[in-house]
């Protein structure tokens, strides 16, 4: 399972106020009550500004990304790890920055890793993107992890030579592990504790949101 660091940035409303964040969430999840959206705004207060966006876009983006992609992915990983041998489940976070995305206030948006998985020009991407220049070195790292999954059902047997060993997710008893994929800086990591707490919050709303 996976998530990009800024999963919500391509989808979130360009909100100027907590009320607009609340309206955005109620439009997407109509069973949410006013009390629910008040709680969401409390979990995601005003954040540092991002280029080309209104004041509460960062909050809307972070909330939507975690509610819709990141936290469900983490819980699916944990569910598989509890149902299968936990060493058969892997999780990653993708943090490859492209200057144009950063300048547009999008960070690392949903599915930005696709060209690294399938190769430059094979994923409806711009061949003039950063993957052709300063992010080119992440391509063999990511691609060979995926090829190894296909060939061996694990990411490590056929991984790129200098890429780190990708530890399995774990069973949640002693924390869980994820790999942080970054150009010239891929490392093993853990899911941040503050994100774990926010995911617990979203889990409490899962039935209402039909997630």
Feature names for model-found ranges:
Residues 70-74, 78-211:
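Mobile gating loops/cap/lid regions near enzyme active sites that modulate substrate access
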Residues 1-133:
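Substrate-gating cap/lid region and adjacent catalytic-acid/histidine neighborhood
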């Amino acid at each position: 399972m996976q998530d990009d660091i800024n999963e919500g940035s391509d989808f979130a409303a360009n909100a100027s106020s907590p009320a607009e964040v609340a309206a955005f969430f109620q439009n997407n999840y109509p069973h949410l009550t006013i009390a629910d959206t008040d709680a969401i705004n409390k979990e995601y207060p005003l954040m540092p500004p991002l280029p080309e966006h209104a004041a509460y876009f960062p909050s809307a983006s972070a909330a939507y990304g975690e509610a819709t992609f990141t936290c469900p992915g983490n819980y699916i990983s944990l569910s598989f790890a509890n149902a299968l041998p936990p060493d058969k489940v892997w999780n990653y976070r993708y943090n490859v920055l492209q200057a144009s995305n950063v300048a547009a206030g999008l960070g690392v948006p949903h599915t930005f890793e696709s060209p690294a998985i399938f190769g430059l020009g094979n994923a409806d991407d711009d061949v003039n993107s950063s993957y052709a220049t300063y992010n080119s070195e992440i391509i063999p790292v990511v691609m060979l992890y995926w090829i190894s999954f296909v060939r061996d059902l694990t990411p490590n047997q056929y991984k790129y030579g200098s890429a780190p060993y990708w530890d399995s997710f774990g069973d949640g008893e002693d924390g869980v592990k994820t790999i942080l994929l970054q150009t010239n800086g891929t490392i093993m990591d853990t899911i941040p504790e503050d994100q774990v707490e926010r995911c617990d919050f979203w889990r409490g709303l899962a039935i209402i949101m039909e997630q």
